[in-house]
């Protein structure tokens, strides 16, 4: 933490910052051989990779696809709810428990929990979110090649909308991580590198 103001140990809703945390736990499952990025998941023709990259064709909410997989970048809570089901089936434990065992406990994120949807229901303190940010910067829980893949745009030609910021063509997204690319306006700093990765949430959270 470079600078802080206020109570950094107070627990706040993470909103969609829940998504990259759950995505990272899915990559742990991939590394352990429990899930493959190319396993079928969600709508017909979609895979775990499509769900992580918001390329499955699912809408924001609801399980009726609005596009074929790999045609549009459609930001989808539903896709991450389905990803949670995939994790539970593959690991044999609830998604909240899986994330706790593979992410929160190893990183020392003592205040963090996901008491509801794996798309948006996470809670944690700012200090704990900073621990996850440090993991993204220098991965310890996911191997180097897989972490590097997560930070590369999947289906890079897809256009799509970043909620609250507009439509971009292309709209790069990695495996659960938004990639800055050439998007303007954007929630990251104006001079941020196009390779910047992270996520923001409606509650005012970001990582």
Positions of predicted regions on the chain:
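Alpha-helical scaffold elements that line and support the substrate/ligand-binding pocket
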Residues: 14-34, 51, 74-104, 128-136
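Active-site-proximal helix/loop microenvironment
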Residues: 112-131, 136
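Secretory-pathway/luminal and periplasmic proteins that interact with or process carbohydrate-rich
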Residues: 57-61, 106-114, 155-162
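Active-site Gly/Thr loop motif
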Residues: 119-127, 152-207
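A short, well-structured edge-of-sheet supersecondary motif
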Residues: 1-14, 25, 53, 206-207
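Short helix- or helix-capping micro-motifs
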Residues: 43-63
